[in-house]
Amino acid sequence: MSPTTLPPPPEHGHVTFLGAGPGDPGLLTLRAVEALANADVLVAEHDVLDVVRRHARQGVAEVPTDTDAADSSAPSAPGTGTPQLKVVDGTSTTVGAPAVRDAAHLVMEAARGGRRVVRAVSGDPGLDAYAAEEMLACVAAGVTFEVVPGIAAAVGVPAYAGVPLRDAEGADVRFVDARTASDRCWTEVGASDGTVVVSTTLDSVAAAAGELVSAGRKPDTPLTVTVAGTTTRQRTWTATLGTVAQTLKQAKVLPSPDGGRPVIAVVGERSAPAQRDRLAWFESKPMFGWKVLVPRTREQAASLSDQLRSYGAVPHEVPTIAVEPPRTPQQMERAVKGLVTGRYEWIAFTSVNAVKAVREKFEEYGLDARAFAGIKVAAVGDQTAKALIDFGVRPDLVPSGEQSARGLVEDWPPYDPVFDPIDRVFLPRADIATETLVAGLIELGWEVDDVTAYRTVRASPPPAETREAIKGGGFDAVMFTSSSTVRNLVGIAGKPHNVTVIACIGPATAKTAEEHGLRVDVMAPEPSVHKLAEALADFGARRRLAAIEAGDPVTRPSERRPGARRRRSTT
């Protein structure tokens, strides 16, 4: 057990000062995730809330602390320079004028009543400008607190940019905040030949480089500049102290209305282009920064979205299919009762939704997984099998090859009256499922109760912004996992733009896409969503390599704008 394992909250509450890291939610520590899971209140800037909220329990109160997002007109606290902050109590159901407090008062107010408060800050609490003041306020108010360190941007961002700060020779490393650095500080780091990590803003990089040159650094000293570090919006430029201003202008980064964005600049030989080109592991991911549309139900999209993120992509889940109960539930009710009374030898699940439908009926009747005792269970696909295991049922049969109805039939044993006391199979399925499994089981000698367990209907249209992005080329790729997702997406949102890469799970889905005027760029080698994601990543890797070999910049598909609409492929 960790020595920092959470104790019961004291009467006056408990505050955890938590480092949220530089931006990638995957960089949160195990201790941070534990603290977030037990929090009653989250206190943080909006961008930090976006990083930590996925690990918080449902119903946690969120308190944004940035006045730009909450109320740009809020004044500073008198005499402190600290912005006054809106208190947003997520436990309140009434709408009223929020109180205005400084950060310390906000944390204290959130801790009242014995609540666990997580005060999340970007990077590490030890480097936050106001965290120490808030800790002292906790001491004065008798509120216990703890500190959960996080990865500081000055360390995490260079690692994601492919710039190691030290090597075997143990070179000196200096960290400078350009906003507060004194002339003496610049003189000291300028006289050193070690690596310098500068925290600054995009429009102040050139000025910081000038300070280092004035202090003695050579103008040809290598320099990297990274913006939005550790996120899929990360961009890194390589230059020298003397050329950084010109490099950013040529890249059309400056001048920019976003010049105030924070950046991390690394000065020294570790930033040399020859070395960084080999070590830039993050930005060289096959689909880095790609916005990928995943038109599926939210329940089905989670694992696929995680896989896409591992390739550097930004998945955007758009439900195209909604699941509803059958219009006439009596058939389903009789079948579930038949499971209990011994009517079936087998039950076959072909989707997660089928498992969910049966489970809901079980719960309605007060049943649980024990009702499957004596019944053989089959499942198509890893996700369906996982849903059964989560229910407490381990499937007896999963296709050894193709994860489809056809694959299940190939492995299904024929009915044998000697070994099979019952000849009937319960098949709960969607109202639009194919008849492949039913026909195959009948051919093997089984009787099949083919029962509509749920209906699939077209989902509501996505927000207007998403529809415009689909039709206007805002997405780099779209993944179609069935013919119905093609038809439904086009029906509720319109046809994807011609620059969007179209990826399909199999020939039938590809044929439907072509019938809708889309050219299919990627097709999975086998009908699996994860194989489809792998195929799309391979496509992205080949595309990236081709650009590098041609001496062209690596761009995303959405950064191209050819005039002609994509037509159906004739090859």
Explain the meaning of each model-derived region:
Residues M1-V148, G342-A354, F372-A373:
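Class I S-adenosyl-L-methionine
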Residues H14-L18, R115-V121, V173, G194-V198, ...:
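Generic beta-sheet signal
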Residues P25-L28, G126-A132, I151-V157, S204-A208, ...:
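Short glycine/serine/threonine-rich phosphate/pyrophosphate-binding segments
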Residues L49, A69-T82, V147-P158, A171-D183, ...:
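Conserved beta-alpha
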Residues G126-F145, A159-V163, R359-E363, V490-A493:
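Short Gly/Thr/Asp-enriched flexible loops that form oxyanion-binding sites at enzyme active sites
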Residues D183-T226:
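Conserved anion/nucleotide-ligand pocket segment
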